């Protein structure tokens, strides 16, 4: 990846989005339903786009919300809908648009008290707590967020009654219905004025913040953190959980300092990410410069992205941990210190996650549930406690309550961040030190992710590749043991290919938004071996694409 000369530096004023212009475009832009890039398109986590290019405008939100109402009726979902919103500039306008449609459809909506911002895990938690013990009148939710993505982006996610990201079958149905409304100039979309929607008998207020914060001791050993006097630094990155951290510190008596509670829809306080864009990614060393600069003031420092579903862990010993490194540490700690978890609860990981997780799980005697990229694949396992933990290589994870029951079925950056403080308290060492102990025993992985150009046709070929189209027998000097196009955990298509040898592997997947494919690679033999894997991976994929396309 080519690193921008601005990476890691404060965002210059000319880079900041013009918020009034952006919000105006949200209301005035008219997407062309005949142009694919301007249609509703649900990715791994909802619909995302930008008002300035007519891919996230009021019409999209009105159409999606009506499509969700249509889906609810068809499924008999008639409980309240928990509606959350993050701090992106387009999120509040989109939340208002959604409320106008929900009120017109008679949906009981739970807005946050005092118009507080709402983290994704707080919405998932609220859905699950409401639905506990119920078989009828089930709740679901919407989170208005583009997650960690740039300030000009808007996003819209739907969480069904299980509390997690909607399955592909659901998002396809909602997407198709929404695009139907767009193509008919919103004919069939019901709507009332915002003032009427706010006054509607179906619009209610819910205390997401305290309901979530008061329950955190059920998933994290807060007493251990308090007793050890762990000094915790937090950077909310101007996100939806900005006011949650002070409440956590007060509730549990923690030595916790929020380095900044600033909220700015242009995110002008951020340092620039690797590619020259502003992105609130807590796993990026370029975006995390503000917290890295003060890490030595704390025993552990943590951050979350804009909707607080992703985490970043900064240690005094090792700086910012790579997501997979922290996941390995978290898994080891949780399965060693959660005596009430089911004995058969497994470890959920994606095909792009480190094989170190497999080695940790094997040492713990726990099965690994390996799935395609996307947190939705962990929902059922977390909901029914057949998984103790589910984590993605992109710094998203959730895990069970201490009693072995479901906590959230969506990613929870707050809980994952607080777990780092628990680990530090219980072990007397920070997660960076714990990671070195793990790799000393199980081997140290070296990882990289690269991008290679691909046409739309080649991307389609890659997503439909079969194992017998990979003809290579060796990878970086080792015999290829497995060629996967379906995930071993659930037999779902991975939308690409994964090639595995004894001490290394790579996975290749097409990008959903750009003309390229991504290669994830890992070696347990060192950087030279890793470079060989990356070099050979591109050749193996190119050869397979030529074979398939001929």
Describe the predicted segments one by one:
Residues 2-100, 104, 135, 198-232, ...:
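An N-terminal, well-structured beta->alpha segment
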Residues 13-16, 21, 25-28, 109-124, ...:
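Phosphate-binding chemistry for phosphorylated carbohydrates and sugar-nucleotides
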Residues 34-44, 189-193, 259-266, 512-513:
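Flexible hinge/switch segments at interdomain interfaces of large molecular machines
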Residues 77-78, 132, 136-138, 296-299, ...:
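Short, high-confidence coil segments that cap the C-terminus of an alpha-helix
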Residues 84, 141-147, 303-305, 390, ...:
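Short beta-strand segments
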Residues 126-158, 165-167:
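Hydrophobic or amphipathic alpha-helical targeting/insertion segments
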Residues 429-550:
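Catalytic-core signal marking the mid-to-C-terminal active-site face
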């Amino acid at each position: 990846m080519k690193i921008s000369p601005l990476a890691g530096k404060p965002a210059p004023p000319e880079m900041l989005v013009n918020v009034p212009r952006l919000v105006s475009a949200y209301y005035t832009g008219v997407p062309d339903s005949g142009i694919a890039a301007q249609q509703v398109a649900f990715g791994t986590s909802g619909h995302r786009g930008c008002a300035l290019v007519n891919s996230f405008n009021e019409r999209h939100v009105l159409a999606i919300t009506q499509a969700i109402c249509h889906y609810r009726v068809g499924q008999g979902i008639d409980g309240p809908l928990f509606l959350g919103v993050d701090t992106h500039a387009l999120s509040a306008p989109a939340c208002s648009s959604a409320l106008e449609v929900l009120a017109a459809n008679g949906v009981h909506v739970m807005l946050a008290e005092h118009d507080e911002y709402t983290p994704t895990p707080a919405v998932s938690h609220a859905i699950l707590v409401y639905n506990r013990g119920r078989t009828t009148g089930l709740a679901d939710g919407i989170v208005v967020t583009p997650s960690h993505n740039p300030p000009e982006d808007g996003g819209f996610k739907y969480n069904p009654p299980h509390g997690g990201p909607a399955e592909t079958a659901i998002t396809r149905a909602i997407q198709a219905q929404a695009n139907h409304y767009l193509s008919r100039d919103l004919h069939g979309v019901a709507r009332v004025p915002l003032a009427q929607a706010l006054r509607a008998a179906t619009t209610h207020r819910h205390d997401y913040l305290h309901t979530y914060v008061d329950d955190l001791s059920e998933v994290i050993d807060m007493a251990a953190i308090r007793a050890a006097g762990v000094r915790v630094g937090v950077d909310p990155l101007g996100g939806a959980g900005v006011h949650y951290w002070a409440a956590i510190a007060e509730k549990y008596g923690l030595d916790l300092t929020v380095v900044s509670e600033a909220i700015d829809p242009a995110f002008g306080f951020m340092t620039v990410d690797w590619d020259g864009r502003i992105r609130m990614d807590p796993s990026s060393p370029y975006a995390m410069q503000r917290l890295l600069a003060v890490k030595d003031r704390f025993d552990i420092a943590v951050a979350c992205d804009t909707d607080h579903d992703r985490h970043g862990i900064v240690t005094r010993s090792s700086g910012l941990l790579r997501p997979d490194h922290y996941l390995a540490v978290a898994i080891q700690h949780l399965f060693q210190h959660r005596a009430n978890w089911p004995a058969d609860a497994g470890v959920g990981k994606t095909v792009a996650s480190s094989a170190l997780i497999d080695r940790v799980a094997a040492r713990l005697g726990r099965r690994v549930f390996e799935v395609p990229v996307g947190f939705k694949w962990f929902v059922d396992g977390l909901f029914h406690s057949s998984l103790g933990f589910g984590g993605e290589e992109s710094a998203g994870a959730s895990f069970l309550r201490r009693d072995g029951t479901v906590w959230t079925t969506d990613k929870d950056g707050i809980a994952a961040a607080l777990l780092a403080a628990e680990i530090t308290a219980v072990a007397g060492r920070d997660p960076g030190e714990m990671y070195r102990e793990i790799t000393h025993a199980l081997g140290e992985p070296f990882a990289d992710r690269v991008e290679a150009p691909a046409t739309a046709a080649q991307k389609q070929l890659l997503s439909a590749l079969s194992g017998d189209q990979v003809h290579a027998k060796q990878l970086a000097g080792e015999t290829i043991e497995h060629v996967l196009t379906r995930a071993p955990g659930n037999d779902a298509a991975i939308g690409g290919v994964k090639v595995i040898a004894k001490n290394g592997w790579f996975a290749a997947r097409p990008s959903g938004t750009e003309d390229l494919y991504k290669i994830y690679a890992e070696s347990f033999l060192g950087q030279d071996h890793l470079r060989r894997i990356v070099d050979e991976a591109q050749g193996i994929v190119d050869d397979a694409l030529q074979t398939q396309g001929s």
